UniProtKB/Swiss-Prot annotation:
Its cofactor is Zn(2+). GO terms for molecular function: GTP binding; GTPase activity; metal ion binding; rRNA binding. Zn(2+) binds at residues 237, 242, 244, 250. Belongs to the TRAFAC class YlqF/YawG GTPase family. RsgA subfamily. It comes from the Bacteria. GO terms for biological process: ribosomal small subunit biogenesis. This is Small ribosomal subunit biogenesis GTPase RsgA. It comes from Streptococcus pyogenes serotype M3 (strain ATCC BAA-595 / MGAS315). PROSITE patterns: ENGC_GTPASE (PS50936), G_CP (PS51721). The keyword Isomerase does not apply.
Length: 290
């Protein structure tokens, strides 16, 4: 039989297939090959009625995230708070390039809008992201229809209200929430093991644990691909390997001058590019010392 792993707990993998859930284990040959099944995996498995089954094969994954590990994700809701902590477009763009690089559709959700004296500044920023092609929403009513027919995970820095949002989406989850520490400006980690939960016509991961910004973008070409607006414009650059920094006849810099390109995003691109180049130089020095 074929199914999807929807929960992993204490060495057992719970596989959903044709409306039923089967408790399975992974055969020893997976350990020998260094393979581990993850929540989201499409698998072949064997199972008798009312007895423990076994995973026989794991299908290739289209994407993955770590800490906690989930695979084959359709979209990720990036939660950014309007206040406490303050909205940070640089941090948002770091989440977005991570998701773009992993071929996971991003949805931007702004929490704590009620703490603002005026929502206009956030809404103006939202229009910029919407012009790029991103879903940018500020209310639960806007978010819920986007969950249908999708496997969705939630991510964001500590304290933005991930657990609170998940509890509003699916109150049955009863996730523990952590209040912001005034002294640190950060929330307590209050996550638990991951599993999928059916709600609003889709599946959501019942952990708000994704706050890591680890990404393996190693060069300017990959970074360019992670910015949709740069990716579209780069086909018009004179040089195929254009980094949009110093090259002549660069379509990205031309769009910046005409106002077609949002300067904030270009500034973040340059910053991220510099970080990538610095990491590469550091790596070269380490290798040279060896």
């Amino acid at each position: 039989m074929q199914g999807k792993i929807i929960k992993s707990l204490a060495g057992f993998y719970y596989v959903e297939s044709e409306g039923q859930v089967y408790q399975t284990r992974a055969r020893g040959n997976f350990r020998k090959r260094g393979e581990t099944p993850y929540v989201g995996d499409i698998v072949d498995f064997s199972a008798e009625d009312n007895s423990e089954g076994y995973i026989l094969a794991i299908y290739p994954r289209k994407n993955s995230l770590v800490r906690p590990p989930i695979v084959n994700i359709d979209q990720a809701v990036v939660i950014m708070s309007a206040k406490e902590p303050e909205f940070n477009s640089n941090l948002l763009d770091r989440f977005l390039i991570l998701l773009e690089h992993k071929a996971i559709h991003p949805v931007v959700y702004i929490s704590k809008m009620d703490l603002l004296d005026s929502p206009e500044e956030i809404k103006a920023i939202g229009r910029q992201y919407q012009a790029i092609g991103y879903d940018f929403v500020t209310s639960l009513e806007e978010l819920l229809p986007l969950l249908a027919d999708k496997i969705t995970v939630f991510m964001g820095q500590t304290g933005v209200g991930k657990s609170t949002l998940l509890n509003r989406i699916a109150p049955e989850l009863a996730l523990e929430t952590g209040e912001i520490s005034d002294s640190l400006g950060r929330g307590r980690h209050t996550t638990r093991a991951v599993s999928f939960y059916n709600t609003h016509g889709g599946k959501i991961a019942d952990t708000p644990g994704f706050s890591s910004l680890d990404y393996d973008i190693a060069n300017a070409e990959d970074l360019n691909e992670a910015f949709p607006e740069l990716r579209r414009l780069s086909h018009e650059c004179k040089f195929r390997s254009c980094t949009h920094t110093h090259e002549p006849k660069c379509a990205v810099k031309a769009a910046l001058e005409t106002g077609e390109l949002w300067p904030v995003r270009y500034e973040h691109y340059l910053q991220f590019l510099s970080e990538i180049e610095n990491r590469r130089e550091t790596y070269k020095k380490v290798i040279k010392r060896k």
